[in-house]
């Protein structure tokens, strides 16, 4: 399975639209918040797909996939 580049790019562009971390770029969400979603259920929309993807990336130690994208965005 190959990573979807568009999905990865959205992880460094889109802000969390609600909740405790509203306004934070998705890739900067803490693992504990993603674990909470994993237990309670991810949203059933595009945001849910992004959060679930980010959860898998962080749980598998693959954050380095996002580093070049973050640098291109100036973070």
Residue ranges and their predicted role:
Residues 1-75:
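DEDD superfamily 3′-5′ metal-dependent exonuclease/proofreading module
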């Amino acid at each position: 399975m190959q990573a979807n580049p568009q999905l990865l790019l959205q992880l460094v562009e889109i802000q969390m639209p609600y909740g405790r971390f509203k306004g934070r770029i998705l890739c900067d969400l803490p693992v504990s918040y993603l674990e909470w979603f994993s237990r309670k259920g991810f949203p059933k929309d595009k945001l849910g797909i992004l959060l679930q993807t980010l959860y898998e990336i962080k749980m598998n130690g693959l954050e380095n996939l996002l580093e070049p994208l973050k640098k291109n965005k100036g973070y």
